[in-house]
Structure formats: C-alpha cells, structure tokens
Amino acid sequence: MRRERLPLTTGITMNVALTGPEDAPAVILLHGFPESHRTWRDLAPLLSDKLRLVMPDQRGFGDSDRPQEVDAYQTETLLADLFALADALGIERFALVGHDWGGAIAWAAAIKGDPRVERLAIVNSPHPLIFQKSLIEDEAQRAASQYMRAFRDPDFEKFVQGIGFEAFFDKSFGKHVDLATIPAEERSTYIAQWSRPGALTAMLNWYRASKMVVPQPGITVDVPDLVLRAFPKIAIPVRVIWGLEDKALLPVQLEGIGEIGDNVEVFPLKGVGHFAPWEAPEQVADALRPFLAGN
C-alpha cells in the first residue's frame, strides 16, 4: 500500500492510501469519525487482488488538510472532494464504499444520481431520510444519538482537553469494542493525529455542519424539511452491510431500507458492532467482494 498527498481542485490537499492493480475496477472507500483511511487496514488486503482501492483521509481527518470553518464541511463540499479525488487519479467511473460519516457522503453521491458512481456499498451508515425520521420518532435512537449534540457544543474541545486524548480514544471506541483488541500502533497513530493543532475542531465540524436535527430526549419537535421532501430513489445497485450490535446506529436504521432504491440488498452481521470494517473484516469482505465485482 502506498500513500500520496494529492492537491485537489477544491482547494485542499488530501492524503490517500492506494493499493491494487491500476487497471482494475476502481473503488473509493470513505471512512467515518474519528478515523482515517486506517479504517480499512484489515479489509484492504482481502480485496486488493482484483480491485483498485482508493482510501482517502477525508478533509479534516488524518493527514489531509484541516479547514477550521464549519462551512467547509457542508455536504456539497465533501461531495466535491470525492469527485475531485477521482479526477486527480484519472478515474472516470467507480464504486463507493462508505462507513459512518463516509457512508453519509456515499449515500449523498448515490442520491444525487451522479453517473460516475456505478454501485454503492454501505457499512453501518444510515440513509439520511431513515435516520432523520428515527431521530424524531424512535426514542431509543434519539437517546443513542445524543453524542451528536455534545459534539456540536462549542465547548466540546475544552472537554476533550480536560480529559486528554487517551480518555477520548477510550470513550470513542470503548463502548463499541474491547479496547484490548485494538493494536497499540492504531491507538498511538490516532491519538497523534487528533493532537495536531486544529484536528479535533476539524473532525467535529462534520457534525456542526450537518443539518440533521437531533432533539433532546422526550421532547416534541416539528417534523424537519428533510423528512417532508421527496427523496429520489437510488437507481444503482446498493448493498447495505450492518453490524447488528451497533450501539450508536440501532437496527431501526434498516426499517424501510429496501424502499430507498430499485436494487437494495441487506447483509446483517450478528455479533458485530459499529466498527465492522475492523471488527469483522473477513465477513465484510465476503459481502463486498462479489458485489464490487458486479455479481
């Protein structure tokens, strides 16, 4: 696996990990919070024999540029990064794989209907309409998503500074996985990246720029416009891989998922949580491999 820092036409420089034959079908894999391309560290070797894998650190994460303005993390800007990355690598058409926030951008690209995206694979990342509806109607999901309200608090950086990045690492991953199973190298790398000037604010700005309404538990709120407006059906093939033990994104996110497109398959993973790409890389690879090959 090699790494490059690519200047993009969107004005940032993006760190990208690359592996697989350059003449193979291209797949862009988008990570989520609070990670980097390292999300795919155990999955990539299982897919790279017949696929060209492109694994960026999305803006604000890892070794990519970290704009400090909240507006720099609007969905349209993040989508522009995706297509600018493909342009920088000379990739015309590609499949998308997204986890967590990376899935949010992958969903957005598919909903937009850009013809460059040939197929979509999602790993534990909710469709925006289903997610917003669940935040209004499902008290369990609303309670599980209160961390989003915390991340939007302008004083959250001070909170993390107070507890330290070691404790933040434990809070971020500890409720999802056994911390003892995370390699020491991964822990030290993430903490070093988060400790850089402006890194934490850049990551949190993904939540602050989001228009997703996250009400406090137990209160009644008006139905957001996101729920009321019509969403176009996704025309390309979609495969949703879901760790059913996800404590942040509950199984309610799978309700109605088959209605969001014309060709949607769901692969539930029992005993697997939110960080499925490195909790169960073999199972995720088994679900991805035939799909990304067009089968």
Locate each region found by the language model.
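Flexible "cap/lid" subdomain of the alpha/beta-hydrolase fold that forms the substrate-access gate
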Residues: 1-3, 12-14, 26, 54, ...
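Conserved HGGG/HGGXW glycine-rich cap/lid loop of the alpha/beta-hydrolase fold
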Residues: 17-65
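Active-site helix-initiating loop/hinge in glycosyltransferases
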Residues: 32, 74, 199, 279-280
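A short, glycine- and basic residue-enriched loop/turn
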Residues: 36-37, 104, 272
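Alpha-helical elements of the RecA-like P-loop NTPase motor core of helicases
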Residues: 38-41, 201, 251, 286
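Short, hydrophobic alpha-helix immediately C-terminal to the catalytic nucleophile
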Residues: 41, 107-111, 285
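Hydrophobic "lid"/C-terminal helical patch
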Residues: 82, 284, 288, 292
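Catalytic histidine-centered segment of alpha/beta-hydrolase-like enzymes
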Residues: 272-281, 285
